Amino acid sequence: MILALNCYQHCLEHSSFYNANYFEAYTEKIIDKGIKLYERNAFHYLKGFALYQKGQCKEGCKQMQEAIHIFDVLGLPEQVAYYQEHYEKFVKS
């Protein structure tokens, strides 16, 4: 699961949308309805990043910020820092 999420993120960072679509679909298929909060929220963030990369900036930014907030609510400061840094690196103000 984590490997699929990392591959999805890498594809999005390099605007490789064809490959990103593959990893998005694969992750959708293997993520179950169990309580995998980290994985589900990381996927939520990356889907927002995909929207942003594809030009839907407002919706994408909103979804990425939601995911960062969820990591904060879950008490995961390392993930907050990681995704906030990613957000600031890729989102043009």
Model regions and ranges:
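Residue register within tetratricopeptide repeats
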Residues: 18-21, 58, 78
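"A position-specific structural signal for the A-helix of alpha-solenoid helical repeats
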Residues: 2-10, 39-46, 53, 79, ...
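Acidic, Ser/Thr-rich low-complexity linear motifs
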Residues: 33-37, 73-86, 93
